[in-house]
Structures are given as C-alpha cells and as structure tokens.
C-alpha cells in the first residue's frame, strides 16, 4: 500500500518543475502543525543538501518524495493531483489524516470513535461553527458527546445528534456502539428529579 498517492498528471508536473532545478533535487511533502485543527500540507523542492537522516523516501517515476518523520504518519492516505479546470491548472493535496493521526483498527473503541468524530463529523459541523467532543463511552455502549461552538444551546442539537451523528456512529461501529447521548442530557438523567 503506497503511503501517498501522486497521480500521473501530478508526477509529470513535478518532473517538469524539477528539470529547471539543480541536479539531484527532489520534492518534499510536509505538514505544518500536524495533528491540530489548523494543520496544513505543503510541497517544496528538496535539494540533496536538505535530505535528513530520518526522512522517508518514496520513489516515483523520475523523482523521489521525501517526508520528515513527524509529518509521515499524518500523510497516510494523502493524495496529490494536478487538475485542469476552466481557470487553469492547479495542484491539489488531500490529506485526510493531517489534522489527526490515523487510528489502528484494533485501537480502543474510544480512540476509533474520536477519530471518526474529528475527521468526518466535525468537518461537517464546522460550516455551522459547531463541533463535538467525545467525553466518554459508557459501559452500556453509548458515546457521550459534548456539543460546542455554534451547536451549544442550538435547538437543532437533538435532531443533529439523533438523525446525523448517532446514526453515522452506530452504522460505523455496528455491534460496539448502541447510540450517542448529549452530555447535558446524560448529566440531567443521572441526578435530576424531572
């Protein structure tokens, strides 16, 4: 399994750019602020003098891509493409794990659920300025979630939770998760009189 996929068009683009560089120059792919919400990926030239001992080298047709050891796990499943659109051509870099490191299939349930929330659910809620934090997973199999940002106190929270988030999580973790609860509802349920 290749760690990073570079399309044929993007490879041709890199080869063309590298022709005008000093011999032995390759490319470097990196992540700035990896594992944070403001992670950003980039590509730069990598002359031979810039290759570090702990870099990983991925060989492509006519050039290599070097990745530093900190960026490496965050670039898993990344894809680089060179797309031609009406306004011209553009290099696109998609790195689904840049903001959060990919979690192993056999990792504890709470880590796997948190990964899905951070990489799939929160990006959807971000357009409303909202986000979800996983607080815990109860012994009886419920994910306890805290809604924050624009979601906090929003009357649509219940709908979002039940129809969107809970449904998605239960489908993905079939047999492991029974459902999801909002922490406010969870707290109210444990020590309230009404």
From Swiss-Prot:
Reply yes or no: does the keyword Disulfide bond apply.
Answer: no
The protein's GO terms of the molecular function aspect are: 4 iron, 4 sulfur cluster binding; iron ion binding
Quote the record's binding site residues for [4Fe-4S] cluster.
Answer: 151, 154
Cofactor remark from the record: Binds 1 [4Fe-4S] cluster per subunit. The cluster is presumably bound at the interface of two monomers.
- What GO biological process terms does the UniProt entry carry, in alphabetical order? iron-sulfur cluster assembly; protein maturation
What cofactor does this protein call for?
[4Fe-4S] cluster
- Describe the task this protein carries out: Involved in iron-sulfur cluster biogenesis. Binds a 4Fe-4S cluster, can transfer this cluster to apoproteins, and thereby intervenes in the maturation of Fe/S proteins. Could also act as a scaffold/chaperone for damaged Fe/S proteins.
Name the UniProt record assigns to this protein: Fe/S biogenesis protein NfuA
Q: Give the encoding gene's name.
A: nfuA
